[in-house]
Regions:
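S-adenosyl-L-methionine
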Residues: 37-60
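Conserved class I S-adenosyl-L-methionine
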Residues: 1-7
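Conserved beta-strand signature within the Rossmann-like core of class I S-adenosyl-L-methionine
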Residues: 102-110
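Conserved SAM-binding loop of SAM-dependent methyltransferases across substrates and taxa
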Residues: 8-21
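A short glycine-rich, Lys/Arg-flanked "PGG" loop and its adjoining helix->strand segment in the class I
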Residues: 17-19, 86-101
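A short acidic, Gly/Pro-enriched loop at the edge of an enzyme's catalytic core
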Residues: 61-72
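C-terminal lobe and adjacent flexible extensions of AdoMet/dcAdoMet transferase-like proteins
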Residues: 176-197
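Conserved Class I S-adenosyl-L-methionine
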Residues: 118-146
């Protein structure tokens, strides 16, 4: 199993323990500097696993082709799209390459309503489901399912400081903090794609 860009390790501390019965956990990051930070984070959480890299500029990865059953990413695709260029497309292609045929790509990210102006994806931290589907399908994936487990109908996705206005970040500081706390964390898409056999 690969987790792309594990950040502070909230999911990693759980995921790194799952493949104990003969499987493996690999954290996938975009630089050697990030790799060292992830190694330290995993150790601090009592978790273990390999750390690999992917270059968003090229899609080249240290994870072998056709070697993984699952790739997961939590709230990271918006960062790839906001980076511009081919970063998102290249990383999606790398995920496709590292997965075995029949393997699963799981994505959770902040959801922009389908009716919203697509230009808002550039800076808000929100993405349309259609944008994520297009990236995945262009890399060769097929949509296999979705879930509303991370849905939040209170989130209107139209805040002055984007998704970071909401908890836990509260980018607006104390301004309207109670209002944003009542909304809660972002509305999120939860998508499952497969690499065809």
């Amino acid at each position: 199993m690969v987790e792309y860009s594990p950040g502070g390790g909230w999911y990693s501390q759980i995921l790194a323990r799952i493949p104990a019965n003969g499987g493996s956990y690999t954290a996938l990051v975009t630089s050697a500097k990030a790799a060292e930070g992830v190694r330290q984070m995993l150790a601090s959480k009592g978790a273990s696993g390999a750390v690999a890299t992917v270059d968003p500029a090229t899609g080249a990865s240290t994870v072998p082709a056709n070697s993984q059953d699952v790739v997961l990413t939590f709230r990271n695709v918006h960062n790839l799209t906001m980076a511009g260029g081919q970063s998102a497309a290249n990383v999606f292609k790398s995920w496709y390459t590292m997965l075995k045929p029949g393997g699963t790509l799981g994505i959770v990210d902040h959801r922009l309503p389908a009716s919203a102006d697509t230009a808002r994806e550039r800076e808000s931290g929100y993405l349309k489901v259609a944008t994520v589907r297009q990236l995945a399908e262009q890399a060769g994936f097929k949509l296999a399912g979705s879930s509303e487990v991370n849905a939040n109908p209170k989130d209107t996705a139209d805040y002055p400081k984007g998704v970071w206005t909401l908890p836990p970040t509260y980018a607006a500081g104390d301004a309207d903090r109670a209002k944003y706390a009542a909304i809660g964390e972002s509305d999120r898409m939860t998508l499952r794609f497969v690499k065809p056999r």
